[in-house]
Amino acid sequence: MDRTCEERPAEDGSDEEDPDSMEAPTRIRDTPEDIVLEAPASGLAFHPARDLLAAGDVDGDVFVFSYSCQEGETKELWSSGHHLKACRAVAFSEDGQKLITVSKDKAIHVLDVEQGQLERRVSKAHGAPINSLLLVDENVLATGDDTGGICLWDQRKEGPLMDMRQHEEYIADMALDPAKKLLLTASGDGCLGIFNIKRRRFELLSEPQSGDLTSVTLMKWGKKVACGSSEGTIYLFNWNGFGATSDRFALRAESIDCMVPVTESLLCTGSTDGVIRAVNILPNRVVGSVGQHTGEPVEELALSHCGRFLASSGHDQRLKFWDMAQLRAVVVDDYRRRKKKGGPLRALSSKTWSTDDFFAGLREEGEDSMAQEEKEETGDDSD
């Protein structure tokens, strides 16, 4: 594991000084510095073991950066311009040696992580622009396109293992169950799709929701499936109850464009209004704001291999890092308070939009409000 995800080392208590070394000490930040791109990034992924971040932008360029909390140490390692149109998604292989990218040009590329060299190109992998990518294991990956097509690929073979088109609109996002048997798809037609990739067959589509389904993830140890939507609502499905929603939760957001789980109960959402919200699932609550891309839509979110950093890309052409360490602990151990309806979102860090102490705000609430909330909570914990 790289040092950025480790605890900061204690300072050496020695009084000895090197007379030849008079340089100012390196500044250590809470998070790595922002990365500025020439175009918005629509694909974002962290390396599974090293402090590397990959991004693919709307011009078709792919970048890999090394990131660090030491000021001035976040750097571009290489870039690739092999895609002819926008790069829609990127993903590292399980061993971290390869980077897979998909594009509006309908191609799948496999790049070497160390040098950025193109090792394999699958041209015209789909008949329509590819919009989403998910790695199943070291050899198998799934792709979804703008017309609802789903393909399953084995990198050791030519051609797709599975090619299905059950959705009527674009595939926005995909997720996998822990057994790697069922592929879940969120589509612009408002339906959650279920595909059995072990038997290579279609299972079912859920009832259509009123807006596009833009994201999908498993929560609550696989017992719940959460889907974000273009109307700003999170739809919840019970596992093995995919036909209809079990619950829904409307955020005060124009839309939910991307979503990433932080714990089994907490996820972060990115919206058109530029705000990154931390949301607790069952009980359903907006915990507060992790950060924002001021006035610009959030395009993609990714969580680092150690879980400490959330990275976000926005239409402001910046990649930003947000510290998740304290938030993860509070949600799991301490967070029991209900946010007042109609009030502003609570800032979860000094980087959000204020320097207020979010945790002090929680501590100041009285015990009576906690008791009242616990009494009311039975109405929130729907199955």
Curated annotation (Swiss-Prot):
The record, for InterPro entries, names: WD40/YVTN_repeat-like_dom_sf (IPR015943), WD40_repeat_CS (IPR019775), WD40_repeat_dom_sf (IPR036322), WD40_rpt (IPR001680), WDR55 (IPR017422), WDR55_POC1 (IPR050505)
Q: Which residues form a coiled coil?
A: none
Question: Which residue ranges have biased composition labelled Acidic residues?
Answer: 12-21, 365-383
Query: Which segments show compositional bias classed as Basic and acidic residues?
Result: 1-11
Q: Where are the WD repeats?
A: 36-75, 82-121, 125-163, 166-205, 208-247, 250-289, 293-332
* Phosphothreonine sites (modified residues): 378
| UniProt superkingdom | Eukaryota
Q: Answer whether the UniProt record assigns the keyword Repeat to this protein.
A: yes
Q: Which key words tag this protein in UniProt?
A: Cytoplasm, Nucleus, Phosphoprotein, Repeat, rRNA processing, WD repeat
Subcellular location, in the record's words? Answer: Nucleus, Nucleolus; Cytoplasm
A Gene Ontology annotation in the biological process aspect, one of them, is: rRNA processing
On whether Hydrolase is a keyword of this UniProt record, the answer is: no
Modified positions (Phosphoserine) are: 14, 354, 382
PANTHER family for the chain:
WD REPEAT-CONTAINING PROTEIN 55
Q: What is this protein called?
A: WD repeat-containing protein 55
Instruction: Please report the organism this UniProt entry assigns to the protein.
Output: Homo sapiens
